[in-house]
């Protein structure tokens, strides 16, 4: 029986309308953003960029023009008068990153904007009015001083070794005697802060502001507090935790100083007058509050007997407090924070609490998570209750803490009286599944606890499910692991005495993560951390911010600087990172040529193919030379790829004079590399590791005509020597899944994913993992480096999930999914995949089910985009004309259907 693909648009149910012109009401503009933020405060760029999405009830929606208006008040904007910018009618399909081109914007002022669009289906109405607020645009805009308590005032406090310090409480009363038009707080509380106005939290942000290299850059936050002020006396209060400013370990980790506050409250009255409340010596401070210690590695200690009832309200008596000290300035440039702070984003309900014979209780959250434990318990006066955290249990049900190294990860709460209390820490987080609770004299219930999941405030953008439960569980583990390690920087791990922004973990990982989360603002900020950590010679620290200062002059770890910038352009259409960081990237490229280029290859390498599966399961790193890839192979292949990236970046930045030098060096390196490392008789690179061959193949160094032979070596090595299992470390895994699939072995790629024996992701899951381990052998390896919550071994797996299994991929000749390539590989062994990705243009969906040679595939293409849909001819396809279908063509192996926006369904008949 002949099979036919039936293509149905989402509007077929409205077939009677197909001949009618849609009214303008059907064209909707939403998801309006300034610099990828919704109605943001604290924009400090001179030409903010606007973006939006469009939707309509009919398929094939294309924007043909837009008009943007900006004014200093919402009333003026609605009336269309006193406009600061009117773009006029611009004929364009661009709906992302359109720069403001009006009158000069003023520091600290609010602005209002709206947009309307023209489309091929009619013109829309003006959008709802949106707003943004400008930040400080000059250092002279700041009038306050850095203040705090410039002493170790409490017993046991220390600024060396395992540091210990109490939180600082600061307060400032002030008067409001007139009607308030607008009030905005500009604040930087280092290391972390909580802010209050008249007893109420100003925001839900936690661990604010973002961590940075404080001697280079200090971030501040901006909050509109207009509705929180009251006539008469008001009280501004701030609590300061240590964060990364007062470091957890000294020496060993970079430390900057004692916690410090810079704040400026600007109050504008309806009569046009202004007041300022600034941080200075008129503030009061104390460290004699209930948070007697806070250290991100070691935990928080809270003594309820020292609570300062009402300290952040007007009526509190602060006569026992000290006058605030003027603190040493951090030294870094004050910068409006470009990305949101961390926030509580999810809650985990414990699955079990078990009493031990020693009187302690073990709480099982059921999920390795990062954040803090909230409790509602009954305590006894002056009897501390201790909460100790771990990812894993020992066989005897005690906590396994060996992999935490020196981190104590312990919170202590001391009740003020007998009775019930509720509490969670403020300035620490833990990576944990299990909690040991001691100090209770009764059996608690699971309902007495809640796990609060804390990570950078960002939206979840990706959903994925398939017919294979293990494939789904790996995705779930990845989801939990990734958000666990978003801590204002992408960290390596959330639990031990490290928690650093290692560059090597994210070179490719950031691209896969971008399918699950809208991580653009976080990674833009991290690129600034990397630049701030670059030294005068041009070398890049492999940890950024450089809390560990490691200038290894390695290639593979710093490559993340380039790959992440490229990801932001490809995934989100934002080229600003490439333009901003191009000079620093060029400096690093030149530096590496000077220190590491020898006879046409890069000879420096520090980390190798980090964490490839060792031959003995107690090892962290393989000791077998046959498993190790030559460091010069790793460095040269990656540097060659970066030269090609720099050609692209130079063209984008208008630095075309740089291009010939990059191209010349790339050609010379390719020739020298192959002369030194490629065996033409065997088509092997170096000692024939999978990593050596797949990097050479995917990064374009294999001589023409040898590609298939090199790939055959990859397959033989994988199947014959490793039984169809992973044999790569951090570098090889970045290319493994896509490389196997691109050259026709999607079956082997799926086998690697669905393996349940060592080494594999399935092995981790069978051993109880609910996140991704640092090591393939995380259940048996030396605890010195054995995190149970890392993401570096994901490599290109998530990219493969969304692009190859689901078929959601940005076309090579487009950015930001303006043109979508939908070509699932339909591997045998998977009968169903359903996935979606919330792109900057809107949601893309792919939902396919296969039964033998019958296919049912539903796709959704968002407004103002197009898609190329590729269907294997094995399903016996034919397509007739239909609204939204632009073109149908055939190749030898597939039907190619080019469509506009809409919902379509392909079903074998």
Predicted regions and their residues:
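Positively charged n-region of N-terminal signal peptides that target proteins for export
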Residues: 1-4
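C-terminal motif of bacterial Sec signal peptides marking the signal peptidase cleavage site
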Residues: 18-19
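Extracellular/oxidizing-compartment recognition motifs
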Residues: 25-110, 114-496, 504-505, 521-522, ...
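Alpha-helix capping and helix-loop boundary segments enriched in small/acidic/polar residues
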Residues: 158-165, 202, 210-214, 224-226, ...
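Alpha-helical support elements that line or immediately flank enzyme active sites
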Residues: 183-187, 197, 372-391, 427, ...
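Active-site acid/base region of carbohydrate-active enzymes
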Residues: 191-192, 262, 280-287, 443-477, ...
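C-terminal capping/lid segments that line or modulate ligand- or cofactor-binding pockets
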Residues: 236, 302, 497-498, 516, ...
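Non-catalytic C-terminal accessory modules of carbohydrate-active enzymes
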Residues: 239, 257-266, 278-310, 336-347, ...
């Amino acid at each position: 029986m002949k099979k036919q693909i039936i293509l149905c648009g989402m509007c077929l149910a409205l077939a009677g309308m197909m001949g009618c012109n849609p009214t303008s009401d059907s064209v909707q503009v939403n998801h309006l953003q300034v610099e990828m933020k919704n109605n943001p405060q604290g924009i400090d760029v001179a030409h903010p960029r606007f973006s939006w999405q469009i939707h309509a009830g009919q398929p094939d929606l294309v924007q043909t023009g837009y008009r943007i208006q900006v004014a200093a008040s919402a009333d003026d904007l609605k009336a269309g008068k006193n406009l600061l910018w009117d773009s006029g009618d611009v004929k364009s399909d661009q709906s992302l990153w359109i720069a403001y081109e009006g009158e000069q914007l003023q520091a600290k002022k609010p602005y209002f904007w709206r947009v309307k669009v023209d489309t091929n289906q009619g013109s829309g109405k003006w959008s709802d009015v949106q707003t943004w607020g400008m930040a400080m645009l000059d250092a002279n805009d700041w009038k306050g001083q850095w203040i705090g308590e410039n002493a170790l005032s409490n017993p046991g406090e220390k600024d060396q070794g395992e540091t210990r310090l109490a939180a600082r409480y600061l307060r400032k009363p002030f008067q409001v005697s007139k009607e308030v038009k607008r009030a905005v707080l500009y604040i930087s509380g280092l290391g972390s802060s909580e802010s209050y106005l008249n007893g109420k939290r100003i925001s839900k942000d936690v661990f604010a502001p973002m961590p940075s290299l404080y001697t280079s850059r200090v971030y501040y936050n901006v909050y509109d507090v207009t509705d929180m002020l009251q006539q008469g006396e008001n009280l501004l209060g701030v609590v300061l935790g240590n964060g990364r400013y007062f470091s957890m370990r000294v020496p060993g980790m970079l430390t900057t100083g004692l916690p410090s506050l810079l704040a400026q409250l600007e109050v504008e009255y309806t009569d046009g007058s202004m007041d300022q409340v600034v941080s200075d010596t008129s503030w009061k401070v104390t460290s004699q509050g209930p948070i007697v210690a806070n250290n991100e590695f070691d935990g928080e200690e809270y003594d309820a007997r020292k609570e300062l009832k009402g300290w952040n309200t007007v009526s509190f008596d602060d006569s026992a407090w000290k006058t605030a000290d003027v603190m040493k300035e951090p030294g870094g440039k004050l910068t409006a924070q470009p990305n949101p702070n961390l926030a509580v984003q999810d809650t985990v309900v414990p699955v079990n609490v078990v009493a031990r014979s020693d009187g302690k209780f073990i709480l099982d959250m059921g999920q390795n998570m990062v954040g803090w434990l909230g409790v509602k318990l009954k305590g006894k006066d002056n009897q501390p209750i201790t909460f100790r955290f771990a990812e894993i249990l020992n066989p005897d049900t005690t906590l396994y803490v060996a992999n935490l190294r020196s981190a104590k990860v312990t919170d202590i709460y001391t009740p003020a009286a007998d009775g019930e209390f509720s509490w969670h820490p403020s300035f620490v987080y833990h990576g944990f599944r299990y909690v040991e609770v001691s100090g209770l004299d009764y059996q608690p219930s699971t309902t007495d606890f809640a796990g609060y999941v804390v990570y950078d405030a960002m939206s979840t953008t990706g959903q994925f499910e398939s017919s294979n439960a293990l494939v789904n569980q790996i995705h779930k583990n990845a989801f939990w692991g990734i958000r666990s390690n978003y801590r204002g920087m992408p960290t390596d791990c959330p639990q031990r005495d490290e928690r650093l922004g290692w560059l090597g973990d994210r070179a490719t990982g950031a691209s896969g993560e971008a399918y699950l989360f809208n991580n653009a603002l976080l990674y833009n900020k991290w690129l600034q951390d990397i630049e701030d950590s670059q030294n005068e010679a041009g070398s890049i620290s492999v940890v950024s911010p450089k809390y560990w200062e490691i200038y290894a002059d390695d290639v593979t770890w710093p490559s993340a600087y380039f790959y992440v910038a490229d990801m932001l352009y490809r995934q989100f259409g934002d080229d600003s990172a490439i333009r901003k960081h191009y000079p620093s990237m060029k400096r690093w490229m030149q530096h590496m040529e000077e220190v590491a280029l020898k006879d046409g290859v890069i000879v420096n390498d520090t980390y190798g193919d980090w964490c490839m599966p060792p031959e003995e399961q107690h090892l962290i790193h393989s000791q077998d030379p046959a498993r190790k890839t030559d460091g010069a192979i790793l460095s040269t292949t990656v540097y060659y790829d970066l030269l090609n990236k720099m050609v692209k970046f130079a063209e984008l930045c208008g630095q075309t004079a740089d291009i010939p030098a990059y191209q010349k060096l790339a050609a010379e390196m390719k020739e020298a590399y192959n002369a030194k490392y490629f065996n033409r008789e065997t088509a092997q690179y170096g000692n024939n590791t999978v990593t050596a061959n797949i990097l050479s193949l995917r990064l374009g160094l294999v001589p023409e005509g040898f590609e298939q032979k090199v790939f055959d070596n990859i397959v033989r090595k994988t199947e014959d020597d490793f039984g169809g299992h992973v044999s790569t470390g951090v570098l090889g895994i970045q290319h493994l899944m896509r490389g196997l699939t691109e050259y026709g072995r999607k079956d082997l790629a799926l086998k690697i994913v669905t393996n349940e024996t060592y080494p594999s992701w399935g092995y981790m899951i069978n051993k109880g993992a609910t996140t991704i381990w640092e090591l393939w052998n995380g259940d048996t390896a030396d605890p010195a480096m054995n995190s149970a919550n890392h993401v570096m071994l994901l490599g290109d797996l998530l990219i493969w999930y969304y692009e190859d299994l689901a078929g959601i991929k940005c076309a090579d000749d487009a950015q930001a999914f303006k043109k979508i390539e939908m070509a699932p590989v339909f591997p045998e062994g998977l009968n169903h995949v359903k996935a979606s990705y919330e792109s900057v243009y809107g949601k893309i969906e792919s939902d396919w089910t296969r039964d033998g040679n019958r296919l049912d595939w539903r796709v959704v293409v968002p407004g103002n985009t197009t898609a190329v849909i590729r269907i294997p001819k094995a399903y016996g396809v034919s397509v007739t004309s239909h609204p939204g279908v632009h073109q149908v063509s055939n190749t030898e192996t597939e039907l190619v259907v080019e469509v506009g926006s809409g919902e379509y369904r392909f079903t074998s008949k």
